[in-house]
């Protein structure tokens, strides 16, 4: 008899299996929260840009400034596993950004492309240096190497960085 058919292991496996729907709900809720963060940040940027937009001869804000701020809003997502890919799909589904305004990278590009329906950029540095807001959905044990890789790009482009890493303080992330 194989050891994995032991009744105690079966109970443990069943308990873990029973938690899967709850875990999926938590992932969806986390993604909805991050979508809300992205949308609020986009609105605040948009309102600041419109407030300082040049006015035409009638005193109206220039519409080109409005569309320019929309097209310049780029969301970078590094890490497109369960949470990252769900987040990207929700961003598009809720029309927070257009698909061409999202740049993604992943350790598994083919899976990320399949899950998100977007082209995957191989360079985390490229994403970090060209986005307005950067969402980080990497596993904690990858963070040290990953952070060294993008440190200079973030300091140069100054995106808003949002991390879903558990167990890391803001001070450590900086």
Where are these regions (language model features)?
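NAD(P)+-binding Rossmann beta1-loop-alpha1 motif at the extreme N-terminus of oxidoreductases
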Residues: 1-114, 119-122, 126
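Rossmann-like NAD(P)(H) cofactor-binding subdomain of soluble oxidoreductases
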Residues: 110-112, 124-136, 140-174
């Amino acid at each position: 008899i194989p050891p994995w058919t032991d009744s105690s292991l079966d109970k443990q496996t069943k308990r873990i299996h029973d938690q899967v729907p709850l875990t999926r709900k938590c992932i969806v809720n986390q993604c909805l929260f991050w979508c809300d963060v992205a949308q609020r940040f986009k609105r605040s940027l948009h309102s600041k840009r419109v407030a300082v937009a040049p006015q035409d001869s009638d005193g109206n804000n220039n519409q080109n400034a409005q569309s320019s701020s929309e097209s310049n809003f780029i969301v970078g997502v590094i890490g497109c596993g369960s949470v990252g890919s769900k987040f990207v799909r929700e961003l598009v589904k809720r029309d927070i950004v257009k698909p061409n305004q999202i740049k993604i990278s992943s350790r598994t590009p083919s899976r990320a492309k399949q899950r998100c329906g977007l082209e995957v950029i191989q360079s985390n540095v490229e994403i970090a240096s060209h986005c307005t807001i950067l969402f980080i959905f990497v596993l904690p044990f990858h963070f040290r190497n990953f952070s060294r890789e993008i440190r200079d790009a973030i300091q140069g482009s100054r995106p808003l960085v949002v991390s879903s890493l558990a167990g890391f303080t803001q001070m450590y992330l900086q």
